[in-house]
């Protein structure tokens, strides 16, 4: 099946014939998002690439007129951005890749959906500024992470990407234009909230709509002051390059503790003291992947048992100061906390890797290395609540996780979860990451099975540990844990998308 010729022509008249395609060998590329996704999605009927907000509006209005369902993509890195049903149109935003403004005085940047982390990050660094960079690598869309997800390693001193969302331009599911925040009153991009009720929470809550409520075509994001160098110093060549920072103002520490409760207490106290650019309990198996250059190197390191011994109950701390004196103060406070709670430094060979390469904290390209094992990996949890709540969630992981390990479905890494505090401990994010082998006949079912068991465990304990995925059956299952949000979500969807054309989901 393909789009009717008359509809195809309407769409081609909007963007030009060179920016729409329905050839099957091209559409095949849009059935897959990443290697670990074993679901066989249908091909879209066509892919179209607008270059402006006006063109996006025109496309959406054609879709409503002919009842054609659509979804939006940028980098195709995540689990979304595919045709969730047969007969859909994919709207690729890659041509809309302009940095429209970087305002150094009011500290915001205005961007389009196709702008990648690797485009924007160096530009703001040059100006002594930075922004929360989602832990997804350099090729990912900045806008997508601000309106959908966006967790990262340095949330201790900042927050999730969503908290930095300012004014934005939104094409509703019916093709109308809405300008949100100060932009609505023609007062510029600087503020997310204008007079009266705010619509920022309509575009996204803790998570976004996965394309289910129209298309955000421009956003402004808040910028922070950057304590690092304006031009990143690099040494070596890929994949063994390094990004060292001046050691008089930047230091990395990793401490191991007797139990997860001790890790939690140290994390809380560092938040109270408001120290650290980054403070987190990180994945230990993923860390081994990040700091090795081949699968063989990974297995040699992992089988040595070093990371299992040193990093199962560990806390990563990155301190940075404007001056050596500021750094020295934070370091003294940190050591007081660590010594009081019973922590001790991990093996020097582990910490040295971070001291030599700060990419982990600035997220230039290091994270792409998790794909190199050649198998699959997938996340579970991805929720947030208090620090204490997240550690209770972590302690419950063995209840369902060991079964998969014993059946040899996943890597034996039960502590491969991260907990990242936000805003100096006002809340925290958790993510459980697991690796599996594509050589297993049933590998496409493994991620779904782990996710299902994880959600069941959350429901059993009443944990707020998941970002409910955009699947109706799962949102209805989790809804009672989250103030019956699914009922409000459905009402909003019906009100704004009467034709149910904006990514209705599976």
Regions found by a protein language model. Name each.
Residues 51, 254-261, 316-325, 382-389, ...:
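Short beta-strand-to-loop capping motifs
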Residues 100-102, 113, 118-259:
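FAD-binding subdomain of flavoenzyme oxidoreductases
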Residues 204, 220, 231-240, 246-258, ...:
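C-terminal cap/substrate-recognition region of VAO/PCMH-type FAD-linked oxidoreductases
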Residues 10-34:
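Conserved oxyanion/phosphate-binding beta-strand-loop segments in alpha/beta enzyme cores
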Residues 6-9, 37-38, 42-46, 58-61, ...:
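Conserved glycine-rich FAD pyrophosphate-binding loop
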């Amino acid at each position: 099946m393909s789009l009717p010729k008359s509809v195809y022509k309407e769409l081609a008249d909007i963007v030009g014939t060179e920016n729409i395609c329905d050839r099957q060998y091209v559409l095949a590329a849009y059935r897959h998002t990443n290697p670990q996704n074993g679901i066989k999605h249908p091909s879209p009927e066509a892919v179209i690439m607008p270059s402006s907000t006006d063109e996006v509006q025109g496309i959406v209005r054609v879709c409503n007129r002919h009842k054609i369902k659509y979804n939006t993509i940028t980098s195709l890195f995540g689990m979304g951005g595919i045709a969730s049903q047969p007969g859909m149109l994919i709207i690729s935003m890659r041509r809309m890749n302009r940095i429209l403004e970087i305002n150094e005085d009011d500290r915001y940047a205005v961007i389009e959906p196709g702008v990648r982390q690797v485009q924007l990050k160096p530009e703001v660094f040059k100006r002594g500024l930075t922004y929360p960079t989602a832990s997804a690598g350099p090729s990912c869309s900045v806008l997508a992470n601000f309106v959908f997800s966006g967790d990262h390693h340095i949330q201790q001193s900042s927050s999730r990407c969503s908290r930095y969302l300012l004014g934005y331009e939104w094409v509703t599911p019916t093709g109308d234009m809405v300008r949100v925040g100060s932009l609505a009153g023609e007062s510029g991009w600087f503020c997310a909230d204008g007079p009266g009720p705010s619509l920022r929470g309509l575009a996204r809550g803790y998570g976004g709509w996965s394309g289910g409520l129209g298309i955000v075509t421009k956003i402004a994001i808040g910028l922070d002051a950057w304590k690092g160098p304006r031009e990143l110093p690099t040494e070596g060549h890929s994949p063994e390059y390094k990004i060292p920072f001046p050691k008089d103002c930047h230091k990395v520490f990793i401490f191991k503790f007797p139990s997860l409760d001790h890790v939690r207490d140290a994390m809380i106290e560092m938040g109270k003291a408001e120290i650290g650019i980054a403070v987190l309990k990180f994945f230990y198996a993923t860390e081994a992947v990040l700091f090795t250059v081949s699968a063989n190197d990974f297995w040699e390191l992992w089988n040595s048992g070093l990371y299992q011994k040193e990093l199962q109950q560990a806390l990563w701390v990155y301190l940075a100061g404007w001056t050596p004196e500021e750094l020295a103060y934070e370091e003294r406070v940190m050591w007081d906390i660590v010594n009081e709670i019973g922590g001790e430094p991990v093996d020097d060979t582990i910490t040295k890797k971070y001291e030599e390469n700060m990419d982990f904290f600035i997220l230039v390209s290091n994270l792409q290395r998790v794909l190199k094992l050649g198998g699959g990996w997938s996340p579970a949890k991805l929720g947030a609540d208090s620090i204490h709540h997240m550690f209770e969630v972590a302690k419950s992981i063995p209840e369902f996780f060991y079964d998969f390990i014993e059946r040899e479905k996943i890597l034996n890494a039960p502590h491969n979860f991260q907990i990242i505090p936000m805003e100096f401990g006002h809340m925290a994010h958790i993510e459980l990451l697991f690796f599996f082998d594509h050589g297993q006949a049933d590998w496409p079912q493994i991620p779904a099975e782990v996710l299902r068991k994880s959600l069941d465990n959350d429901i059993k304990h009443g944990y707020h540990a998941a970002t409910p995925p955009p699947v109706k059956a799962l949102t209805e299952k989790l809804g009672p844990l989250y103030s019956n949000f699914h009922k409000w979500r459905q009402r909003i969807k019906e009100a704004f998308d009467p034709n149910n054309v904006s990514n209705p989901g599976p």
